[in-house]
Design a protein with these regions (language model features):
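Core catalytic lobe of class I
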Residues: 1-245, 255
């Protein structure tokens, strides 16, 4: 691709800019797996509990509230661009909540994907519901999909997953803790995913030397885990502060 990388070391590449524009510069069908944690468009004037403290839910301009139509159009554009760079045997994982996951599921089917699994990520230590007017939000949904074409033979490392699960078939409800403080020692991102979660996703659907893409790099957890497991990585991120955070994590002792 002609675009100069913001960072390029040890099969770990970062691009700075609009993900939809930059996806068009990546070679078609060159990616083996995509993990995406797109904006939920939740930021407003609310508050939540984090680390025992009351904090604002305003994450930044990139997460400002949008209309239903705007959110759906955005999801359609980036998922369509991802399909173009994903090889025919590759798969895509997309994390979301009730605020965006229904749009994402619909777009996946509209754009010619077949959903393989609807993973429920159950958080073992979710923040409390301070309003006391709804149930505690303790789960997120991760959709796993492949291209809906007859020749597509997606990769699923069944035996690896079974071994991780005490030699039993792994179910579609995954229990892990939230991101550990040790994973935030270089700085933090407001929607940072835990290393344990990405390890399972990457081990399930890729082999060593496969090329993984995260179109919403954030703090770089996908890339950190990809390198740890001897996979190649490309991350795209609009905010320079999070690219710099990713680089600090990559270059820190222990790669956390």
């Amino acid at each position: 691709m002609s675009k100069k990388f913001y960072y390029d070391e040890d099969n770990f590449k970062l691009l700075h800019g609009d993900t939809i524009l930059l996806l068009k510069k990546i070679e078609p069908q060159s990616i083996d797996m995509i993990f995406a944690d797109p904006p939920y468009f939740l930021s407003g004037d609310g508050i939540t509990c984090s680390g025992g403290k009351m904090v604002s839910v305003n994450k930044g301009k990139w997460d400002e509230k949008r209309s239903i139509k705007e959110k759906h159009n955005f999801n359609k554009r980036w998922i369509r661009a991802c399909k173009n760079v994903l090889n025919d045997n590759g798969t895509i994982w997309i994390s979301g909540t009730m605020h965006n996951i229904y749009s994402i599921g619909m777009v996946l089917e509209e754009e010619g994907f077949k959903i393989l699994n609807n993973i429920t990520w159950k958080k073992l230590n979710p923040p409390p519901n301070i309003s006391c007017r709804t149930f505690v939000h303790s789960t997120e949904t991760i959709l796993w999909a492949k291209k809906d074409i007859s020749k597509a033979k997606h990769k699923f490392n069944y035996d690896v997953m079974k071994k991780l699960n005490n030699n039993k078939q792994m179910k579609d409800v995954w229990e892990t803790s939230l991101t550990k403080p040790s994973e935030k020692k270089c700085g933090k991102h407001p929607t940072q995913k835990p290393i344990e979660l990405l390890e399972r996703i990457i081990l399930a659907s890729t082999d060593e030397n496969d090329l993984i893409l995260d179109p919403f790099n954030g703090s770089g957890t996908t890339g950190i885990v990809a390198n740890k497991l001897n996979r190649k990585y490309i991350g795209i991120e609009k905010e320079k502060e999070y690219l710099d955070l990713t680089i600090r994590r990559k270059e820190s002792e222990g790669n956390v």
